Amino acid sequence: MALSKAKGNDGKITYPPGVKEISDKISKEEMVRRLKMVVKTFMDMDQDSEEEKEQYLNLALHLASDFFLKHPDKDVRLLVACCLADIFRIYAPEAPYTSPDKLKDIFMFITRQLKGLEDTKSPQFNRYFYLLENIAWVKSYNICFELEDCNEIFTQLYRTLFSVINNGHNQKVHMHMVDLMSSIVCEGDTVSQELLDSVLVNLVPAHKNLNKQAYDLAKALLKRTAQAIEPYITNFFNQVLMLGKTSISDLSEHVFDLILELYNIDSHLLLSVLPQLEFKLKSNDNEERLQVVKLLAKMFGAKDSELASQNKPLWQCYLGRFNDIHVPIRLECVKFASHSLMNHPDLAKDLTEYLKVRSHDPEEAIRHDVIVSIVTAAKKDLLLVNDQLLNFVRERTLDKRWRVRKEAMMGLAQIYKKYSLQVEAGKESAKQISWIKDKLLHIYYQNSIDDRLLVERIFAQYMVPHNLETTERMKCLYYLYATLDTNAVKALNEMWKCQNMLRHHVKDLLDLIKKPKTEAGSKAIFSKVMVITKNLPDPGKGQDFLKKFTQVLEDDEKIRGQLEKLVSPTCSYKQAEVCVRDITKKLGNPKQPTNPFLEMIKFLLERIAPVHIDTESISSLIKLVNKSIDGTADDEDEGVPTDQAIRAGLELLKVLSFTHPISFHSAETFESLLACLKMDDEKVAEAALQIFKNTGNKIEEDFPHIRSALLPVLQQKAKKGSPRQAKYSIHCIHAIFSSKETQFAQIFEPLHKSLDPGNPEQLITSLVTIGHIAQLAPDQFTAPLKSMVATFVVKDLLMSDQLPGKKTTKLWVPDDEVSQETMVKIQAIKMMVRWLLGMKNNLSKSGNSTLRLLTAILHTDGDLTEHGKLSKPDMSRLRLAAGSAIVKLAQEPCYHEIITLEQYQLCALVINDECYQVRQLFAQKLHKGLSRLRLPLEYMAICALCAKDPVKERRAHARQCLVKNINVRREYLKQHAAVSEKLFSLLPEYVVPYTVHLLTHDPDYVKVQDIEQLKDIKECLWFVLEILMSKNENNSHAFIRKMVEYIKQTKDAQNPDDQKMNEKMYTVCDVAMNIIISKSTTYSLESPKDPVLPARFFTQPDKNFSNTKHYLPAELKSFFTPGKPKSTNVLGAVNKPLSSAGKQMQSKSSRMETVSNASSGSNPSSPGRIKGRLDSTELDQIEYEDYTMISSPLSGKKSDKRDDSDLLKSEVEKPRRGRKQPLIDPDDSFSMDELSKPAQEPKSRTSQRGRKRAAAASESEEQAWQEKRLKEDLLENEDEQNSPPKKGRRGRPPKSAKMAISKEEPPVTTPKRGRKNVVPIESPPTDEEDHLEISEEQDSENIDQKRKGRGSSKKTPQKSDSTDSALDTSRPTPQKRRGRPPKTPTVQQKKSHVGRPRKVVSKEPESEEEMEISQNSPALSENISNEEETADEEVVAPSTGRRRTAKKRRWIQRMKSELEGPLL
């Protein structure tokens, strides 16, 4: 190479060939040109050119002069920087610059030039890139390690590179920057805090969002230098976290964000930092804990995080924060739980336990977010959440807060739609969440209108999406309905019913609006608006909005027309969509984004629009059912057995025929139904009949060919079909045909003539058919019906036992195990009731006779003839039938008037029957009549006796029914304010007098001052009063108190002269008064209204008499705890300790219940076995669980399961102390005097409970009994099986001799629950007995006295020593106990023919048409004979001979002759 003259060692600068001197004397352009040549020269040189290195040394020093480093032109500076970079490369490892200051200036200069990398579009960018590449490759900056100010140089370099990096740079730029910076970290001795900050600052979220490339650069750098930089990162966090030296860095406040980012980049960077977080989690500073929890939530939930498995102590410590005292911390834990569930399924088990607790958190937001987290994970993949987690969401659908309930319901709905309605989800997933559809529909039982509306919306959008095509929509509905459980089906049916009712209300409103304006019309419109408002959320605002909407309807004819079309029965789904859209568009205001008025109207339109059902939909649904019938449907693929699909489809059509009857009016639909009617399947035919009944009113006119084909089928079903088919056939004929009388005659005549007790199956159908004809056409067959009832139904069916029943200890068996003869008798009873309900009058006194017959069945425990042929389950069925029949007749005013108080009281006692199913079904009948406002108010008082039910679920369900009935009446009175004349029969508070009267005559209430019996009275009263007093509306507490005070001024109208009965009544009043005083603070206020007591139950108050006496024993007053009634939970309490709920105090009585149950040999669920009380803690627990839905049929499931297994197990294992035992004369049977004796005899005729008896004893007996109970308490833990029952029981006392009754204290007549009649010795003859002679009365009194002292008996362990002296007056009287009483042996075991005295059932005949019982019945002669024998024994005292006085024989003969008239 030719060189310019220069000498390196004499300080002269040698330039490359062709390059002249570079100085400030040349222009910028020339300088740039010459520098480019210099750059080219240095670029081509390598480290091995020692000669050239020496030659250009001075040039290298010259280029580092301040002239170049501070040159104003950027091109000059860039070229100089490139030269310097090459010089460092060429002279490496030693630089030609020895001055530290110069080196610092040079590197600071090069760093400044690197800023040119920012503009990737610059023409000089390649030269900047060359500069970066050169210094990165050579690691030129490593020279600075020797400098004192190296930290400043490195920090500036890092900041420069992080600031210039952008998305215009390619991977090479990124790589060189990482190489350059990593060499400084990896090869340096230390990393200063400033340098570390320059890297970490790019990880802070704010910076990260501003420059993503800088974040990526920092991330790459940290990954590259992880091992080298980790100690400095650890030191930084130690200083900040542990020592609190936040001043060491500006990033101290972002420490938790940095930990998260560093963990995501490389977890090894924090190996020593993470243990410090465990310490921070336990900090006393709430905010600090919150920050750590936020951090760890993200770290544990990150997708690829292994932190939980790598650091288990930290994970466990973090889980502990789910229970932190600070609400935001718990909230944060719950919020991020979904990430852990979604990204780490293995952590679900740990999280489940903590989410369970948080799902009951007192804080609403936390419970809400638990649901959100679980639902979010479930929507991603159902496998991520276990059944337990889904159950937490399920529980929260009953939360007390609407926001939480809504989130839970919507979450379940979304999960259901995703996995049940989408085929790709798979059958397994659909199976796992199959319960959701049932649960969501169950919520429709809630009282809250918001819940109900949301269920409707969920059903329309998620369960059966309304936007599907008609065929798909109906298929979805068809198979949904087929797989719903019973209660969900009821809820869905109720939903359609409510929507249909609201549709009719809106239609009525439109009709009222169209009428000319009048004052009455305005009131009617207002009333209708109020009714509709109750079907909308927020009734307060809803009322105002609906008034406004009513005004719009009056003014805008177009909107009114659209609404009329919408509520029209012929409106199709597509028309409904158009109408809703047009109305909302017209009412909407674009300038008002949130319009509460429009939202409310949308709610209304959603509820009334037929979004699912129209004529096309019904046709499509019937085609689906037909496909299933033909076997061409894909039922099995849908997971539904074909038979189940067909029945469900027809059931669905049946329900829709109620709510959308017009949609069925097509020939195709009716022809399909006719085909179903001819099928062999009974259920299918039944459903088809019901659909015809509901929709067929136009068939005769519009579809004559259907009418012609239908008539013979209906006649055939009425004569030969199943009982239900026969019933619906008659109703179809009544609904469809105008010439129904002719059709009825063609059916009635042959059936009437061919009634055959020998063919019970056909006889049942005939009785059903005739019964319904009698009800629908009572005047058409008056004479033959009356004759048939008298001669056939009563005489041949009810009073005749053909075959002996199966011997069993069970009290109930399934329907298919009930004997045909019993089923016939039940239908006979129903037929008589239907006949009476059809007549609706008692002119022929048939009602009186029937009521006497029904009460006789109850008296005789269901075995009317008392031949002993009937099995116990059959007797239970007949008791239920008789009780239900009386309740049915009581709903008709003309028959309610003739039901005597004794008959009413006897009917009431069926609610305490020993058979669980009898109690359950009778309660349902009672509730049905009460909720429809058909039964008089006194029948609501029967609910008070449910407090004695031993089954907790039965008590809870009875309470629900009572709550609903009280609310129904209050709601009715609010809506019909003008019905003041009905106030006495509707105001719920008026149930109190009836309850007091009923409890006064309760056969369990024997001794006026008995503490245990009064406790039971208290429980029964509180059962009713608790609900009545839950709200003090219109000063009702004072009104109830005043009512009770009024009763104490009256006498018992049933037995006005019976001092003991009146004293009982006043004692019950005192119990009620104590309850009122202890549970209310406003009882002492003056009631604005004066109560009116029912004259049938109470005499007129004696204004001259002030009854201020206190009748309660002092010991009982301690049982009335002061304070207000405990408020009941409506929805699930949050974080409530459930373990203590439902526990009863372990009192003496509760222990006695347990022992009593253990030692008795019968059904543990019957009142005769145990009698628990429903205390307040039980109530809370019940309401927390499933009893929040007032009208819900869900309650009682547990007891249903026990019906045939648990409840009956003890019956099979242990002999139950039955009503009839071998000591009773087998010939002893039902006699005719039962049906003819006067039914209302003051004092002597008191209400009884069929199968249960009670009697009183002397004071000495009571004391002895108390002493015996104390001894038994001491022994009860030693031998439960052998210890006697200690719980009071409804039953008769042990048999003792006549002389055991003290002369000073005459025996007390007590109400008894049995078939035996007791006439007190001191009772004077009544007017109805004037025709009897005095001696005859005395004889009858002697008989009754004897009966009281004797009666049937059977030895039991607890009575083993009862055969002592007949004169032992200290013999204890066992306390009452529900169920059949234990039998005790008579005092003298002589040959005793024990008669069966009975309670009087009816009044004296008022007409010649009286009940007739065949003289051929063995019950008559045998029973009379037994009574005569018993009477003779009693008269002659201990003599074993039998004598019959002439007067006695004459009296019996007279009684026989009086019963020989016609029955009806």
From Swiss-Prot:
Listed Basic and acidic residues bias regions: 1197-1215, 1234-1244, 1265-1274, 1455-1464
Annotated HEAT repeat ranges: 383-419
DNA-binding span(s): 1287-1299, 1375-1387, 1391-1403
Region of interest (Disordered), residue spans: 1126-1464
Gene3D superfamilies per the UniProt record, alphabetical: Leucine-rich Repeat Variant
SUPFAM superfamilies: ARM repeat
PTM field: Phosphorylated in mitotic cells.
Gene Ontology biological process terms from the UniProt entry: cell division; DNA repair; mitotic sister chromatid cohesion; negative regulation of cell population proliferation
GO cellular component: chromatin; nucleus
Comp. bias regions, Low complexity: 1156-1168
Source organism (scientific name): Xenopus laevis
Keyword tags: Cell cycle, Cell division, Mitosis, Nucleus, Phosphoprotein, Repeat
Biased composition (Basic residues): 1286-1295, 1347-1357, 1390-1400, 1441-1453
Gene name per UniProt: pds5b-b
InterPro entries documented for this protein: ARM-like, ARM-type_fold, AT_hook_DNA-bd_motif, Pds5
Subcellular location: Nucleus
Name used for this protein in its record: Sister chromatid cohesion protein PDS5 homolog B-B
Keyword RNA-binding applies: no
UniProt function note: Plays a role in androgen-induced proliferative arrest. Required for maintenance of sister chromatid cohesion during mitosis.
GO molecular function, one term: DNA binding
